[in-house]
Amino acid sequence: MTTLIKNIGLYRNGKVTENQNISLNGKYIKDFPENPKDEDYAEVIDGKGMLAMPGLVNTHTHVAMTLFRSYADDMELMDWLQNKIWPAEDHLDDDIVYWGSMLAFAEMIRGGTTAFCDMYMFMDSCAKAADKAGIRGNLARGLAGISPNAQSGLQENIELFEKWEGAGDGRFHVMLGPHAPYTCPPDYIRQVRDEAMKRGIPIHIHLSETKGEVENCLKEYGKTPITLMNDLGLFELPTLAAHCVHVTDEDIAIMQEKHVRVAHNPGSNLKLASGIAPGVKMRKAGVTVGLGTDGASSNNKLDMFAEMRLASLIHKANTYDPFAITATEAMEMATVDGAKCIGYDDLGKLEKGALADIILVDRS
C-alpha cells in the first residue's frame, strides 16, 4: 500500500527541514516528493504541526518487568537481583508475561519507541504481545547455566528461534540470551556458542555491569568478563553486550576488533549505582553504542527520550567536555546506531529504501 505523509517537519542528519513530504511503499520509504497529489496514494496523513523522526530503538530491556516497576528501589544490583527480583520472577507465568509485555509496548509506542531488544522468560508470550502491538522486536530467552532449567531454557530459546525468526513480516528476530558470566559458567557459554553457530543466531548478554562482577571474574578466571567471553569464542558470533560499565582499554579494543555492539543503559546504571559506562571512549574507539532503558524495575520507565538526555548529560559531566555527546549524537545512539546494535542497516534513518519505522512528534 502506498502512503503519503505530508506537510511535516523532517528530522534528518541532525537538521530539521520544514514543509516536507514522505512517500511510503509498504514498509519502506519510497521518496520525498516535492509536489505530491493525494489521489496518487491509498492513504494520506496530514502531518501539519508534526516532526517526522526515525522510530527509537531500545537496545536492551526486559519488557515484562513493567510489573515490577518501583518494586525494589535503593539497592545495588546483586542485592536487588538475589533478594527481590529473582524470587518475584519465580511467580511469573505465560499470562502474566503477556500482559506485562503489552503494558510495556503501550508505554514504548506512546513514547516513540518502534523497536526493542528483549531478554526474559516466557518469551513466546512476549512475542505474541509484540505481534499484536505491531512493534518490531529482537527476542532472547534469558539463560542461566547455574539454573536447574539451564538445558530446558536453551531448548526454549532454540524453539523461539524456529518459531519467530523472521515472523511478523520480518519484524521479529531471535537471539540466544546467556544472562551473564556470573550465571553462565564457561562450559555453558561454550554450549550456547555451539548451538548459536549451528543456526547462525546472534547473542545478547550482560557484561561488566558492576565493579564487583569484574573483580569476581578476575578472581575466579584471571580475566575480565570481556576477555573471558572472547577467549571462549562467544564473540565469533554477532554479539550485543548490555552495560559494559567497567571495561578496560584492552576490553574496548577487543570489542572493536570483534564488532561487539554495546547497549548503554545510563538510567539503569545510575539507579543501581553500577557506575557510568565509558560511552564516549567506546564510540571514539569505533564501537557501536546504542541506548537502552533496561527493565522498568531498574529504571522505572521505558522512556528513550529520557535516556538520550541522560546519555548526553552524564558524559558531559563525567568528561568535563560539553561536546562529549551532543544532542545529535544522542539521537544517533537511539536510532541508527541502535538499529545497528540489533542487526539492521536499513533502520533508524529517514532515507530512500529504509524501513518506514517513523514517528510523528507533536510540536504544538
Enumerate the predicted regions with their spans.
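Metal-coordinating catalytic core of metallo-dependent amide/deamination hydrolases
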Residues: 125-245
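Glycine-enriched alpha-helix->loop->beta-strand junction motifs that scaffold or abut catalytic
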Residues: 134-136, 193-201, 234-237, 254-263, ...
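Active-site gating loops and adjacent loop-to-helix segments of metal-dependent hydrolytic enzymes
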Residues: 67-99, 106, 133-144, 211-238, ...
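Divalent metal-coordination and catalytic microenvironments
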Residues: 8, 22, 27, 49, ...
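N-terminal metal-binding scaffold of metallo-dependent hydrolase/deaminase domains
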Residues: 1-39, 50-51
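His/Asp/Glu-enriched, well-ordered alpha-helical/loop segment
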Residues: 231-234, 238, 280-363
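Short acidic/polar active-site loop segments enriched in Thr and Asp
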Residues: 114-115, 288
